[in-house]
C-alpha cells in the first residue's frame, strides 16, 4: 500500500522513494523478518498448547529423531505466511496482477498444507488426506494461476517457453504451456515439501532460491536489463522482487526458531506454500527451466523418492538406504548438521549457476 504514496510525490517529494522496487524489496524483507521474530514466540506457544504431542515422528526414520524432535509443534508455516503477507500488502504495488496471482497460489497451497497438518496432528499419524485429492486441489489452483498469468502476459509472450543459455531457443507451446506451467508450480510445491525433513534444511534453500528469483524478476521486468541480457522482457514482473524479499525476511525470522534444535517445524503449511510461490514466480518470469537449476536440491530430493518407490515396486529393492535422500545420508552416518549445511552449500552453488544462465547466451 505504501507504493501508492509515490503518487503524492508532487506534494511531498520524499514519497518518490516508494516508486523504487529495490527500496520496497528491502522494506518488505525487514518488515517480514521483524514480524516473524516479534510474534514468533507467541505463535509457537499457541501451537504447542493446541497440538500437545506436536508433529508425529516417523518410527522407521533415524532413531535420533525420536529423541530430539518428538513433541515439537508443526504448522510454523503460519508465522511465515503471516509475515510474508503483511510485508507484501504493505510494500508491493496493489495494482500488480502478478503479485495477486502469487499471493493466491501461496494461500491456496498453504491452506491445503494446513489441512494436511491438522489431520496429521489430530490423528497422530503421518497420513493426511488422500494424496490424489491433494494433488488434484493443487493442480486446480495451479491451472487457474497459469491461465491468469497467460491472460495478463504481454501479447505474443503468454505461451512461450524459453531455454536458458540458448538465446534463440524459444518455443511456443500453445495451450500446452498451461499444463506445463501448472506442473512446474505443483512440482515445486511438493519438492519443497519433501525437502522439509531436517531442522533448517528447507527454509535456507528456499530463501536462496527466492533471492535468485528476486534478482531474475527485477531484471526481466526492466526493459533495459532484459534487452541487455537478451531475455524475454515481461512487464510487471519486477514487482515480484518485493514478494521474494518478503519471503526472505519471513524465512530469516522463521530460521531463528527453526535452527537446530528446532522449536517449531514449518509443516506442509509452509513447505507447500513456499514451493508454490517459487513455482509461480518462475512461471510468471518465464524462467521455468531455470527453476530446475536454482532449485536443483529440491529436484534431487523429490527424484530420490520417485526412484526409491519405482525401484521397490519394480524390483523389490531399494536404491537408497532411506528416502528422501537427506535421510539416506543420515543412515550412512552423517550428522544432521552436516547434511543440512552441505545441502545449503549445494543450494548456493546451484543458485549461482542459475544466475549465470542469464549472462551465458
UniProtKB/Swiss-Prot annotation:
Main location: membrane
GO CC annotations, alphabetized: plasma membrane
Pathway annotation: Cell wall biogenesis; peptidoglycan biosynthesis
Catalyzed chemical reaction(s): UDP-N-acetyl-alpha-D-muramoyl-L-alanyl-gamma-D-glutamyl-meso-2,6-diaminopimeloyl-D-alanyl-D-alanine + di-trans,octa-cis-undecaprenyl phosphate = di-trans,octa-cis-undecaprenyl diphospho-N-acetyl-alpha-D-muramoyl-L-alanyl-D-glutamyl-meso-2,6-diaminopimeloyl-D-alanyl-D-alanine + UMP
Membrane topology: Multi-pass membrane protein
EC number(s) from the headed UniProt entry: 2.7.8.13
One biological process term in Gene Ontology: peptidoglycan biosynthetic process
Subcellular location: Cell inner membrane
Enzyme class (EC, first level): transferase
Domain of life: Bacteria
Required cofactor(s): Mg(2+)
Pfam families: Glycos_transf_4, MraY_sig1
Molecular function per GO: metal ion binding; phospho-N-acetylmuramoyl-pentapeptide-transferase activity; UDP-N-acetylmuramoyl-L-alanyl-D-glutamyl-meso-2,6-diaminopimelyl-D-alanyl-D-alanine:undecaprenyl-phosphate transferase activity
InterPro entries in UniProt: Glycosyl_transferase_4, PNAcMuramoyl-5peptid_Trfase, PNAcMuramoyl-5peptid_Trfase_CS
Keywords: Cell cycle, Cell division, Cell inner membrane, Cell membrane, Cell shape, Cell wall biogenesis/degradation, Magnesium, Membrane, Metal-binding, Peptidoglycan synthesis, Transferase, Transmembrane, Transmembrane helix
Annotated TM spans: 27-47, 72-92, 99-119, 139-159, 169-189, 200-220, 240-260, 264-284, 289-309, 338-358
Disulphides: none
Family: Belongs to the glycosyltransferase 4 family. MraY subfamily.
HAMAP family assigned to the protein according to its UniProt record, in alphabetical order: MraY (MF_00038)
Xref: NCBIfam families: mraY
Function recorded in the entry: Catalyzes the initial step of the lipid cycle reactions in the biosynthesis of the cell wall peptidoglycan: transfers peptidoglycan precursor phospho-MurNAc-pentapeptide from UDP-MurNAc-pentapeptide onto the lipid carrier undecaprenyl phosphate, yielding undecaprenyl-pyrophosphoryl-MurNAc-pentapeptide, known as lipid I.
Full protein name: Phospho-N-acetylmuramoyl-pentapeptide-transferase
Organism, scientific name: Methylobacterium sp. (strain 4-46)
Lineage: Bacteria, Pseudomonadati, Pseudomonadota, Alphaproteobacteria, Hyphomicrobiales
Protein encoded by which gene: mraY
Amino acid at each position: 500500500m505504501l507504493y501508492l504514496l509515490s503518487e503524492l510525490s508532487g506534494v511531498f517529494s520524499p514519497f518518490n522513494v516508494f516508486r523504487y522496487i529495490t527500496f520496497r524489496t528491502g522494506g518488505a524483507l525487514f518488515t517480514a523478518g521483524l514480524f516473524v521474530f516479534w510474534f514468533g514466540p507467541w505463535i509457537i506457544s499457541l501451537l504447542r498448547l493446541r497440538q500437545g504431542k506436536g508433529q508425529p515422528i516417523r518410527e522407521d526414520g533415524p532413531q535420533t529423531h525420536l529423541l530430539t524432535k518428538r513433541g515439537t509443534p508443526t504448522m510454523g508455516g503460519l508465522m511465515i505466511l503471516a509475515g510474508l503477507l503483511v510485508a507484501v500488502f504493505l510494500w508491493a504495488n496493489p495494482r500488480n496482477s502478478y503479485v495477486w496471482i502469487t499471493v493466491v497460489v501461496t494461500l491456496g497451497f498453504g491452506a491445503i498444507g494446513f489441512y494436511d497438518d491438522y489431520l496429521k496432528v489430530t490423528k497422530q499419524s503421518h497420513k493426511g488426506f488422500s494424496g490424489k485429492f491433494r494433488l488434484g486441489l493443487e493442480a486446480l489452483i495451479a491451472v487457474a494461476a497459469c491461465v491468469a498469468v497467460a491472460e495478463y502476459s504481454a501479447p505474443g509472450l503468454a505461451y512461450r517457453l524459453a531455454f536458458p543459455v540458448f538465446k534463440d531457443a524459444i518455443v511456443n507451446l500453445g495451450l500446452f504451456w498451461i499444463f506445463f506451467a501448472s506442473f512446474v508450480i505443483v512440482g515445486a510445491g511438493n519438492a519443497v515439501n519433501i525437502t522439509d525433513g531436517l531442522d533448517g534444511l528447507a527454509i535456507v534453500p528456499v530463501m536462496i532460491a527466492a533471492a535468485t528469483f528476486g534478482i531474475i524478476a527485477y531484471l526481466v521486468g526492466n526493459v533495459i536489463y532484459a534487452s541487455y541480457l537478451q531475455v524475454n522482457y515481461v512487464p510487471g514482473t519486477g514487482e515480484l522482487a518485493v514478494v521474494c524479499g518478503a519471503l526472505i525476511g519471513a524465512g530469516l525470522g522463521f530460521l531463528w526458531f527453526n535452527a537446530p534444535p528446532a522449536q517449531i517445524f514449518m509443516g506442509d503449511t509452509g513447505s507447500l506454500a513456499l514451493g508454490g510461490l517459487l513455482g509461480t514466480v518462475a512461471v510468471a518470469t518465464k524462467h521455468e527451466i531455470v527453476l530446475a537449476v536454482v532449485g536443483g536440491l529440491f529436484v534431487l530430493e523429490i527424484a530420490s523418492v520417485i526412484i526409491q518407490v519405482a525401484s521397490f515396486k519394480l524390483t523389490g529393492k531399494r536404491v537408497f538406504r532411506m528416502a528422501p535422500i537427506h535421510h539416506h545420508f543420515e543412515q550412512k552416518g552423517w550428522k544432521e548438521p552436516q547434511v543440512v549445511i552441505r545441502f545449503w552449500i549445494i543450494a548456493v552453488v546451484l543458485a549461482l549457476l542459475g544466475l549465470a544462465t542469464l549472462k551465458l547466451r
